[in-house]
């Protein structure tokens, strides 16, 4: 009997792998309805807003695993990582979200913030410049310009200090 269970488990695993390889999500494979995913997202978002980051991370991680094509889930997990000061992980997740979102430059903007917090001003500048040049979201462009201006001011002050020495 154990041999049959083992064979059937292997076959199920193989079928799941085949489905995922062809673009299906685990949500689809397991037949999880979208309204359940939406409910889980609502809980994750609520935990995030309450500052309960460990709980939010657990929910967003589950959502990402079960539907890796939904950029909202990836953005949520990235935002949690950013608040937990896991900046490189947040940058990696924002990169995934950007590939899913195509012309939405919010992930690039948030990556710029993370780069600044990792003290990588040149990379941060590249992110904010890209947002400034390419986004159609005027509000996001304005925020990027504020960061670019602050970086410029900081550079000017740094050069002034170096000249005094």
Swiss-Prot record:
InterPro entries listed in its UniProt record: T3SS_Ca_resp_chp_LcrH/SycD, T3SS_Ca_resp_chp_LcrH/SycD_sub, TPR-3, TPR-like_helical_dom_sf
Statement: the UniProt record of this protein carries the keyword Cytoplasm: yes
User: Pfam families attached here?
Assistant: TPR_3
State its location(s): Cytoplasm
Keywords linked to the UniProt accession: Activator, Chaperone, Cytoplasm, Transcription, Transcription regulation, Virulence
Top-level taxon: Bacteria
GO CC annotations on file: cytoplasm
GO MF terms on file?
Answer: identical protein binding
Does the record's keyword annotation contain Transcription? yes
Could you describe the subunit structure of this protein?
Dimer or higher-order oligomers.
- What is its biological role? Type III secretion-associated chaperone required for SipB and SipC stabilization. Prevents premature association of SipB with SipC, which may lead to their targeting for degradation. Along with InvF, required for transcription activation of sigDE (sopB pipC), sicAsipBCDA, and sopE.
Q: Which family does it belong to?
A: Belongs to the LcrH/SycD chaperone family.
Report the protein name in the record: Chaperone protein SicA
Q: Which organism is it from?
A: Salmonella typhimurium (strain LT2 / SGSC1412 / ATCC 700720)
Higher taxonomy: Bacteria, Pseudomonadati, Pseudomonadota, Gammaproteobacteria, Enterobacterales
């Amino acid at each position: 009997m154990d041999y049959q269970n083992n064979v059937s488990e292997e076959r199920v695993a193989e079928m799941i792998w085949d489905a995922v390889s062809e673009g299906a999500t685990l949500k689809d494979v397991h037949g999880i309805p979208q309204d359940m995913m939406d409910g889980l997202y609502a809980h994750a978002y609520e935990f995030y807003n309450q500052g309960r980051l460990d709980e939010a991370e657990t929910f967003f991680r589950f959502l990402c695993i079960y539907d890796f094509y939904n950029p909202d889930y990836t953005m949520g997990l990235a935002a949690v990582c950013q608040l937990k000061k896991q900046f490189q992980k947040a940058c990696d997740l924002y990169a995934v979200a950007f590939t899913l979102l195509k012309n939405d430059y919010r992930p690039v903007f948030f990556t710029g913030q993370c780069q600044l917090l990792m003290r990588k001003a040149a990379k941060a500048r590249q992110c904010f410049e890209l947002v400034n040049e390419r986004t159609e979201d005027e509000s996001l462009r304005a925020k990027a310009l504020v960061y670019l201006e602050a970086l410029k001011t900081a550079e000017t002050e740094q050069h002034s200090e170096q000249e005094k020495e």
